[in-house]
Amino acid sequence: MKQSYFSLLIFGATLLLGVRPSTSTDLPLELINLPPGFAIETFATNVVNARAMTLGHNGTLFVGSRSAGKIYALVDENQDMRSDKMYVVAEGLHAPIGVAFKDGSLYASAVDRILRYDNIETSLDQPPVPVTVTKSLPNERHHGWKFIDFGPDGMLYVPVGAPCNVCVRPDPFSSILRMRPDGSGMEVFARGIRNSVGFAWHPTTKTLWFTDNGRDNLGDDLPPGELNHAHKIGLHFGFPHCHGGDIPDPQFGKGADCS
């Protein structure tokens, strides 16, 4: 029960952290349908433009943002499942949406780079100077924000979206990259992905599952968004030739096998 509650609390934070100004009584929590045994509450309401989140080893919740350009740290000091204190651990960044935590360090993305803040939970009030993991990511703003996470192989994964609605561009666009924690060994893990903003690994098979937001201007609800899984490196998931698995693109799908 405790694990289920906390999972939904974090899910709820995804929806509620960016609401400002507000109180918990203003939020329509009753509209969120939950399975039996789950509960949802407001964790914090003072985090502007909240996006991705990750937990530190000591329970600090780190939150990325987009237009705010900040990375926040939320601390629940009395263990009542509500944030008691908020720190801004970085600011002035270009869409620092993605955050991940490994070996005591916070990893944070901006559009064209990934930074690392070492021993961050011991210095929230005086954050360390970040280490640049990589600054070689594309800087195009269209689908340019970078969500990040560590896989079960210890590699850091980052999707790189297509810089357009639909187009053909060379690597690393329309792909998911991975690299070692120090930024070395960067490689394309999967291709043909327009814009993935959510991904996770199956706890048993370790297979990567990820969403893909389909192209615009084909019609209402067309193409559908995708939920894909990649059991090995080197797979191609169709973009820009095929959408939703079996829908040829009117411009780029000629001759493509979308069956």
Could you describe each region identified by the protein language model?
Residues 26-48, 84:
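A short helix->beta-strand "capping" segment at the edge of beta-propeller domains
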Residues 100, 112-151, 159-162, 185, ...:
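Asp-box/WD-like beta-propeller blade repeats and closely related beta-sheet repeat scaffolds
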Residues 53, 99, 148, 196-199:
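Hydrophobic core register within WD40 beta-propeller blades
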Residues 23-36, 145, 163-166, 174, ...:
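Beta-propeller domain segments
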Residues 74-80, 117-125, 232-237:
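Short loop/turn segments immediately following beta-strands, especially the blade-tip
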Residues 60-64, 105-108, 155-159, 207-211:
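Conserved beta-propeller blade signature
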Residues 42-47, 87-92, 133-140, 188-192:
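Surface loop/turn motifs at the tips and blade-to-blade linkers of beta-strand repeat domains
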Residues 55-58, 101-103, 150-153, 202-205:
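Residue-level detector of Asp-centered blade-edge/turn motifs that repeat once per structural unit
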